[in-house]
Amino acid sequence: MAEQEPTAEQLAQIAAENEEDEHSVNYKPPAQKSIQEIQELDKDDESLRKYKEALLGRVAVSADPNVPNVVVTRLTLVCSTAPGPLELDLTGDLESFKKQSFVLKEGVEYRIKISFRVNREIVSGMKYIQHTYRKGVKIDKTDYMVGSYGPRAEEYEFLTPMEEAPKGMLARGSYNIKSRFTDDDRTDHLSWEWNLTIKKEWKD
């Protein structure tokens, strides 16, 4: 039996139900200080120096100005019942993702994992923002607060809370997702598009 596609009215209703108030918050982020400035502050205070070393680690700061401070490397759909890895390499050709699609079985629980590196300076208030579209209609927007991170050689990983994939005849089909990794300064560290297909089973 052919799967029933949602009508324009049904998509509009879904969008309305998922619409969140986007009131601006009266919040002013603190002035950004470099790692060097932080390390120079109260440098004669031995206890404070040890505290900052424990907090920041022995930072090997990248001096190459051509390397972005924040590099987003991978997006992974973490799902214990998936038959294989669901991963996007974000260091390659981002345009190719528009021609591919993850398959997700309806109703399964999953999380999104973002892997990234911070190379030179502390980044405050990082956020992962995701807009979901169905047939060109935006049906959902989700903001995830990632937090503040300092430079280190190892990658960081951020996991979203557990979510349940939509289910039911009207939920099955293709979704276009526009993702963005940003921060308090509204720096666009990376923006990319990818596709998700909800099916009754993992494989037809």
Swiss-Prot record:
Cellular compartments annotated: Cytoplasm
Region Disordered, residue ranges: 1-36
Chain residue ranges for the region called Hydrophobic: 66-83
Entry-annotated residues carrying Phosphoserine: S34, S47, S101, S115
GO molecular function, one term: Rho GDP-dissociation inhibitor activity
Modification type N6-succinyllysine: residues: K141
Gene3D superfamilies cross-referenced by the UniProt entry: Coagulation Factor XIII, subunit A, domain 1 (2.70.50.30)
Annotated Pfam families: Rho_GDI
Tissue specificity remark: Brain, lung, thymus, spleen, small intestine, and kidney, and weakly in heart and liver.
Keywords per UniProt: Acetylation, Cytoplasm, GTPase activation, Isopeptide bond, Phosphoprotein, Ubl conjugation
InterPro entries: Ig_E-set, Rho_GDI, RhoGDI_dom_sf
Function: Controls Rho proteins homeostasis. Regulates the GDP/GTP exchange reaction of the Rho proteins by inhibiting the dissociation of GDP from them, and the subsequent binding of GTP to them. Retains Rho proteins such as CDC42, RAC1 and RHOA in an inactive cytosolic pool, regulating their stability and protecting them from degradation. Actively involved in the recycling and distribution of activated Rho GTPases in the cell, mediates extraction from membranes of both inactive and activated molecules due its exceptionally high affinity for prenylated forms.
Entry protein name: Rho GDP-dissociation inhibitor 1
Gene source species: Bos taurus (Bovine)
Protein encoded by which gene: ARHGDIA
